[in-house]
Amino acid sequence: MGEPIGRVTRCSTQGFVGAVRQLDPETPTFGTLCKAEAQGGNIYVVGAVYDISIEDDPFARHVASSERANSEQIADHVVNRQTPIEISAIAVGYIKDEKYFFSLPPQPPLTMAEIIPLTDAEIIAFTAGFEFIPTLINFRNDELTAAVLRAAAQCRPESEQHYYLQGGGRACARLLNEDFVRLETLIQRIKP
């Protein structure tokens, strides 16, 4: 299991929002697949990160607006202060008894549940059949759909990545067969 990247602060069956101590260059990123425990550990809700926001605070505004913010003030704010960073994730499925389900979870995670990025092996298993795509298509954030597909492709051996993206494009085409403009834009975004 991966290292936690934050804790749930708000949640519903549609998704969850979590607080993150600080941004790591690798996670969380837009499109990261992560999970949070629900039902007392009986299930894990799988979410796709669709927003990362860094809230300001009065001290940050004060330092940023000063004519000469010295490096010590900036370092103190970046390293020592609790910068309010939030990630928002849409629920794209859940894990129960090591099986993947591609519907909304029966219950949301509880507040303070750890948010853990899926491992490469979990991402490969969860994204293998493209069953998660309808939820993303219905969320109407094509950038997110493309980001999740590209990230899932990157977890696979290099020789499989192109074929995986083609399969993802076909799955999107079946769902968007009456919206060619949106489909064409999405296909362009899927390209690595």
What are these regions (language model features)?
Residues N80-P192:
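Charge/polar-rich, low-complexity and marginally structured segments
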Residues G15-V20, E55-R68, A89:
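Short, solvent-exposed secondary-structure boundary/capping segments
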Residues V49, D57-N80:
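Charged substrate-recognition surface patches at the periphery of nucleic-acid/ligand-binding domains
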Residues P4-T9, T32, I43-I54:
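Short beta-strand-centered aromatic/proline hotspots
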Residues M1-V17:
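Short, basic/aromatic beta-hairpin or loop at an interaction surface
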Residues E26-T29:
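Short, well-ordered loop/turn sites that connect or cap secondary structure elements
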